[in-house]
């Protein structure tokens, strides 16, 4: 059933794992649009959730609810009375016991609670991990929303994060079909961009390790990237668009790790960035092909990876996670010439 949310004002939605990297930006956008937001967190009084209360509209229209992903009754109480649900909460670990069952149960619990509450639409944050991991796919094939990872490959390589994401998404689709819930799923690639939360998450460490000098080399790998602000907006767009359905791949560009390091070196030459690849024997890995046309058709315009990297580093500096070095005399001019928006 297509959802109709022509006027967000007065509408209430639930965001699970509201204090997370992507979720915090979703909450911000929802509050700016006039929604009342019920955000689930493990402990509403934890100082690490203070950034949510400080968001514009937070004091008036944000309710933080204590709910663990494995506590069905608590999730049900949070979702009750909501028009929509954004399920972003999920374990991020390589431990199969902590990753797989909690992720699957969490997805099922949210769908079941949404069905009981007669929620109009559920939007779930899945991952490229549920899409891309297939060694038998033609390297020249274009990765799109119809692609699924190979479960046996994920299991045999002990890639429990991707395995968990895939089985959790499959469980969500099966439960939604069984319960008659309108479900839309987003599959973002590696997410960059400025964090609202005070803590460092795994994808931000991906950038931080190069800047601090802890990574002396970069891997001979390619990865696709997307900005956290675009991912958050995509969640809201697919919730609000009556025509939205199925899965949406969220990726701006696919790049070799060496290219990412080169961009960082041009933007921030003061940091001890690696200059050598860990694997110089084999040919340089080629980025895979993908299409992001489906989400573009809903009006999403992607932030460039270069801009995203710049904003990520500036934010890490401002939050005290990265010591700001003294800028070279021409840094400001060089950044402008590189097509970067300063202070955005």
Curated annotation (Swiss-Prot):
What reaction is this protein's catalytic activity? Answer: (E)-cinnamaldehyde + NADP(+) + CoA = (E)-cinnamoyl-CoA + NADPH + H(+)
User: Which parts of the sequence carry Phosphoserine?
Assistant: 7
GO BP annotations listed: circadian rhythm; lignin biosynthetic process; response to cold
GO molecular function, a single term: cinnamoyl-CoA reductase activity
Stretches of the chain forming a coiled coil according to its record: none
In this chain, NADP(+) is annotated as bound at 17-23, 42, 48, 68-69, 88-90, 161, 165, 188-191, 203
The record places the active site at 165
Q: Which domain of life is it from?
A: Eukaryota
Q: Where is this region: Disordered?
A: 317-344
Tissue specificity comment: Expressed in leaves, stems and flowers.
Q: Could you tell me which Pfam families the record lists for this protein?
A: Epimerase
Q: Cross-referenced InterPro entries, in alphabetical order? A: Epimerase_deHydtase, NAD(P)-bd_dom_sf, NAD(P)_dehydrat-like
> Which EC class is this protein assigned?
oxidoreductase
Instruction: Report the EC number(s), separated by commas if there are several.
Output: 1.2.1.44
| Alphabetical UniProt keywords | Disulfide bond, Lignin biosynthesis, NADP, Oxidoreductase, Phosphoprotein
Give the protein's function. Involved in the latter stages of lignin biosynthesis. Catalyzes one of the last steps of monolignol biosynthesis, the conversion of cinnamoyl-CoAs into their corresponding cinnamaldehydes.
Instruction: Give the UniProt family note.
Output: Belongs to the NAD(P)-dependent epimerase/dehydratase family. Dihydroflavonol-4-reductase subfamily.
State the name under which the record lists this protein.
Cinnamoyl-CoA reductase 1
Give the lineage. Eukaryota, Viridiplantae, Streptophyta, Embryophyta, Tracheophyta
């Amino acid at each position: 059933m297509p959802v109709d949310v022509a006027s967000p004002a007065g509408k209430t939605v639930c965001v699970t794992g509201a204090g997370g990297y992507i979720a915090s930006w979703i909450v911000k956008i929802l509050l700016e649009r006039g929604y009342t937001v019920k955000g689930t967190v493990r402990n509403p009084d934890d100082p690490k959730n203070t950034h949510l209360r400080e968001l514009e509209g937070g004091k008036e229209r944000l309710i933080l609810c204590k709910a663990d992903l494995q506590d069905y009754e608590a999730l049900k109480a949070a979702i009750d009375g909501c028009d929509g649900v954004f399920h972003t909460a999920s374990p991020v670990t390589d431990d199969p016991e902590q990753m797989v069952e909690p992720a699957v149960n969490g997805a099922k619990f949210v769908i079941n609670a949404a069905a009981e509450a007669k929620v109009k639409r559920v939007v779930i944050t899945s991952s490229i991990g549920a899409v891309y991991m297939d060694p038998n796919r033609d390297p020249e094939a274009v990765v799109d929303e119809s692609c699924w990872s190979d479960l046996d490959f994920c299991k045999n390589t002990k890639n429990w994060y991707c395995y968990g994401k895939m089985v959790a998404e499959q469980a969500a689709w099966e439960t939604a079909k069984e319960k008659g819930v309108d479900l839309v799923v987003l599959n973002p690639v590696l997410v960059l961009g400025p964090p609202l939360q005070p803590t460092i998450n795994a994808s931000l460490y991906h950038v931080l390790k190069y800047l601090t000098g802890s990574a002396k080399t970069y891997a001979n790998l390619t990865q696709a990237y997307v900005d956290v602000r675009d991912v958050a907006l995509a969640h809201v767009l697919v919730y609000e668009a009556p025509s939205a359905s199925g899965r949406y791949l969220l990726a701006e560009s696919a790049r070799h790790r060496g290219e990412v390091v080169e961009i960082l070196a041009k933007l921030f030459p003061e940091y001890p960035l690696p200059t050598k690849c860990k694997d110089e024997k084999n040919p340089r890995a080629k980025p895979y092909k993908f299409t992001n046309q489906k989400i573009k058709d809903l009006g999403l315009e992607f932030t460039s990876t270069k801009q995203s990297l710049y904003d990520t580093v500036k934010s890490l500096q401002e939050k005290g996670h990265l010591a700001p070095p003294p800028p070279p005399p021409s840094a400001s001019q060089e950044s402008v010439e590189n097509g970067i928006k300063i202070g955005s």
